[in-house]
Curated annotation (Swiss-Prot):
Gene Ontology MF terms: structural constituent of ribosome
Family note: Belongs to the bacterial ribosomal protein bL32 family.
Pfam families cross-referenced by the UniProt entry: Ribosomal_L32p
Keywords: Ribonucleoprotein, Ribosomal protein
Species annotation: Azotobacter vinelandii (strain DJ / ATCC BAA-1303)
The keyword Membrane is annotated on this UniProt entry: no
Assigned GO CC terms: large ribosomal subunit
Protein name in the entry: Large ribosomal subunit protein bL32
Length: 60
């Protein structure tokens, strides 16, 4: 088991953790329908950048 030789200071500990913060997902609003969706993803209605790309019809 690894054991430290010298105690790490609060400053060194906090600087190491500076990259651990979580970020919120970037959301976009579809211009034609107003739906909120993830960036670079198709909206739940099947629209992407104002165009219908997926027909959400019946699955027969």
């Amino acid at each position: 088991m690894a054991v430290q030789q010298n105690k790490k200071s609060r400053s060194a500990r906090d600087m190491r953790r500076s990259h651990d913060a979580l970020e919120a997902n970037a959301l976009s609003v579809e211009k034609s329908t107003g739906e909120v969706h993830l960036r670079h993803h198709v909206s739940p209605d099947g629209f992407y950048r104002g165009r219908k790309v997926i027909d959400k019809g019946s699955d027969e």
